[in-house]
Amino acid sequence: HGDASIKDALVQLGQKDLLIDCQGNWGNILTGDEAAAGRYIEARLSKFASEVVFNKKTTEWMLSYDGRKEEPVTLPIKFPLLLAQGSDGIAVGLASKILPHNFVELINACIAHLEGREFQLYPDFPTGGMADVSRYNDGLRGGAVKVRAKISKIDKRTLAITEIPYTTTTESIKDSIIKANDKGKIKIRKVDDNTADKVEIIIQVSPDESSDKTIDALYAFTDCEVSISPNACVIWEEKPHFLGVSEILRRSAEHTKWLLGRELEIRLGELNEAWHAASLERIFIENKLYQLIEGCKSREEAYAAVDKGLEPFKKRLRREVTLSDVQR
């Protein structure tokens, strides 16, 4: 696929404002404007990502395609990132659509799971809007989420759309409104898209039309209302599985526990090694073991002399004394 797919994936991650600090034109998820070319944008891990997403010591590595470098098999993420970001893709015979969820609600759900309490998860969309999640079905196949734009009245003849449904853009909303008007489904005089950092689509209603009826028609005949069908399919232990979002979160929380335990084990090992080295150095100096090597004629003889001199103190240590310890 070349590097285009890498750039597209990076832009999707950056636009969700969680893992990446972005510099340059990264596009706009509200208007659908694309990001600038890869050479014009810059990225770095956010503070959150540096703490939660990457740890060189707990990462499983594999050789790169040419065998000259190493690359991670997976990243040891201590957070249900898949549920926070959402995912949408297809493969041969498989499709997956995982909706994004609220950051704080995911944290609270993880805490509830670890405390043995029940929890429920529902999607939360970066574009806003109002959602009917009564048929969410835990994100599994067969469920559906109905999402509506937020439409308010400015005056009797003016409507404003300030939030849009997930999977739409202000451009697609505007186009659908114009098409509905051309077909006679709604009656408007003008529609303007003034969106920048926030959604703002202004609709001028025809003088002979009720604004309430126009709002109903917008939901019925335009992209102001869409239905999204989730289909949570994930790769678990190298095989595809259809799992509900609650089960995905449980497994993520348990994996995070394992990763934190692994980090503590590694840190404990490092501290034990530091204590071992400091203890050997102290024994060597305080007991003047360096005097044992003064008459030695070879390096091997000196190593043996030091090892023998350490013999009375080995019971105090937490592990055996190795040749590398003596050489140090």
Residue ranges and their predicted role:
Residues 16-23, 44-60:
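Proline-centered turn/helix-capping motifs that create local helix->coil transitions or kinks
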Residues 1-17:
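Extended, well-ordered alpha-helical scaffold/bundle regions in very large, multi-domain proteins
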Residues 27-39, 149-152:
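Extended, highly charged linker/hinge segments and catalytic-adjacent loops that couple domains
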Residues 29, 50-78:
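P-loop NTPase nucleotide-binding/switch module
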Residues 22-29, 195-197:
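Short, conserved phosphate-binding/catalytic loop or strand-edge motifs used
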Residues 47, 81, 85-90, 94-328:
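C-terminal interaction appendages of subunits in large macromolecular complexes
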Residues 1, 28-34, 66-67, 94-98:
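Conserved short loop/turn motifs at secondary-structure junctions
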Residues 1-6, 37, 41, 71, ...:
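Secondary-structure capping and boundary motifs in well-ordered enzyme cores
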